[in-house]
Amino acid sequence: MRFTKLALGMLAIGIWLGSTTAYGQGKAIDVNRSSMKILVSKSGAFSAFAHNHEIEAPIAQGKIDSSGNASVQLRVDAREMRVMDPEVDVDKRAEIQRTMQGETVLDVEKFPEISYQSTSVTSRGDDHWEVRGDLTLHGKKQPVAVEVSSKDGHYRGSASIKQSDFGIEPIRIAGGTVKVKDELRIEFDIVAAQ
């Protein structure tokens, strides 16, 4: 339940997309070959009895433009995010999924989309970029920066975001003795369409 905050990490995916400027103007993101995941960690006095969570955040649509001022746009359908924890039984995973998509976390009925729009892409040397942009999640827009590297046509990177920056209070249970950390880690591997 508390790990539903991972959805915030999906927004960071858009950050790494800015690193794909080598593909040329107006290239779409290959959503079938690209991946993004959000890692949610536990904390609290009894966190040893809880689980960390991994959330799959499939990219619904994205575009990379390297003409003039490089840019990237990305969209994730929050309703398609999935809890992937294989060590958690099916019923518990379904409960975590419902909590993540419910009103207390992502509220996917009210905020079905997560988006990222770059504001700047800066080269940091061969095959490395810093991408800055705005992530919109849970109806709130916040600046997010990501370091991206490329190899063999893949653009990889990670970023950390805080749920509270997007108006989401991290899940707490048992009086706060088990809770989700405010900070989420987002990892991605992006491929531009050929």
Go through each PLM region and give its residues.
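Positively charged n-region of N-terminal signal peptides that target proteins for export
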Residues: 1-6
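Bacterial N-terminal signal peptides
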Residues: 7-18
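Low-complexity, acidic/polar, glycine-enriched regions of mature
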Residues: 22-194
